Swiss-Prot record:
Pfam families: Ribosomal_S8 (PF00410). One of the primary rRNA binding proteins, it binds directly to 16S rRNA central domain where it helps coordinate assembly of the platform of the 30S subunit. Transmembrane segments: none annotated. The lineage of its organism: Bacteria, Bacillati, Actinomycetota, Actinomycetes, Mycobacteriales. Keywords: Ribonucleoprotein, Ribosomal protein, RNA-binding, rRNA-binding. Part of the 30S ribosomal subunit. Contacts proteins S5 and S12. This is Small ribosomal subunit protein uS8. The keyword Ribosomal protein applies. Belongs to the universal ribosomal protein uS8 family. One of its GO terms (cellular component) is ribosome. One of its GO terms (molecular function) is structural constituent of ribosome. GO terms for biological process: translation. It comes from Mycolicibacterium gilvum (strain PYR-GCK).
């Protein structure tokens, strides 16, 4: 069965595993999910991720990050642009999440970028998700 919105599924699995205090979450692999995981790692929301070859297809294993007393690194995740309603932002009107404390993940013509990277490069694109 095909999935309508694999990015929303990825974010939902992360949100559920994070709220259940799991150490890692396994999900189906795709290039865009791996790129989102790379952004989350570089911004400090997850500790690491890896790709594993499964019997059928690849899987992406994301290791969640918690503080010393098990406080969550990810306070919230929200899918912005959906298959039924795409949301785009110009380079002059990029969104800021919680006044710059969070991150907006934007799909640009030069790949996935955070809102700060896209602003620095002067590119806009589709706003995929907010993470804070």
């Amino acid at each position: 069965m095909t999935m309508t919105d694999p990015i929303a599924d990825f974010l939902t699995r992360l949100r559920n595993a994070n709220s259940a205090y799991h150490d890692e979450v396994t999900l189906p692999h795709s290039k865009i999910k791996a790129n989102i995981a790379e952004i989350l790692k570089s911004e400090g929301y997850i500790s690491d991720y890896r790709t594993e070859d499964a019997r059928v297809g690849k899987s992406l294993v994301v290791q969640l990050k918690y503080g010393p007393s098990r406080e969550r690194s990810i306070a919230g995740l929200r899918r912005v642009s959906k298959p039924g309603l795409r949301v785009y932002a110009k380079s002059t009107n990029l969104p800021r999440v919680l006044g710059g404390l969070g991150v907006a993940i934007i799909s640009t013509s030069s790949g996935l970028r955070t809102d700060r990277q896209a602003s620095r490069e002067g590119v806009g694109g589709e706003v995929l998700a907010y993470v804070w």
